[in-house]
């Protein structure tokens, strides 16, 4: 930005000095007009040129291209864990078939008995 401003100031000072020189030296009228034309052409050329900014190579990589080197951290086992963090390991126990079932688990096969009519006496 500062370079562009400096170029603009230099161009305006250059034009004003050429115009001042053309006004003071009236004897060299053809030479003064040719110099103002060349200076005007140069200023137009400098105004339309884009200055290339040299970018420094950044060492920025894409997130996926970064190599994550994880160091193997040695963690000691915590002495006490929270209740929710405890792992419940249930061992598979061999169950034998129960000899006697509970009363509610028994299957009741009741046959409906008809009431026996008592003889009339």
Curated annotation (Swiss-Prot):
Residues 1-21 form the signal peptide. Disulfide bonds: none annotated. Residues 22-63 form a propeptide. GO terms for cellular component: periplasmic space. It is found in: Periplasm. It comes from the Bacteria. Proteolytic processing gives rise to the active protein. Keywords: Periplasm, Signal. Residues 74-83, 94-103 have a biased composition (Low complexity). Residues 84-93, 104-113 have a biased composition (Basic residues). Transmembrane segments: none annotated. The keyword Nucleus does not apply. Residues 40-121 are annotated as: Disordered. Required for growth and/or survival at acidic conditions. This is Acid shock protein. It comes from Yersinia pseudotuberculosis serotype O:1b (strain IP 31758).
């Amino acid at each position: 930005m500062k370079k562009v401003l400096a170029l603009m100031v230099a161009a305006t000072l250059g034009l004003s000095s050429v115009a001042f020189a053309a006004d003071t030296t009236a004897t060299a009228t053809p030479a003064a007009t040719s110099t103002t034309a060349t200076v005007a052409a140069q200023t137009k050329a400098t105004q339309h040129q884009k200055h290339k900014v040299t970018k420094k190579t950044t060492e920025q990589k894409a997130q996926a291209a970064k190599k994550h080197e994880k160091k193997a951290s040695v963690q000691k086992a915590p002495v006490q864990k929270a209740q929710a963090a405890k792992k419940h390991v249930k061992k598979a126990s061999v169950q034998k078939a129960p000899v006697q079932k509970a009363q509610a688990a028994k299957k009741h096969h009741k046959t409906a008995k008809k009431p026996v009519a008592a003889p009339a006496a």
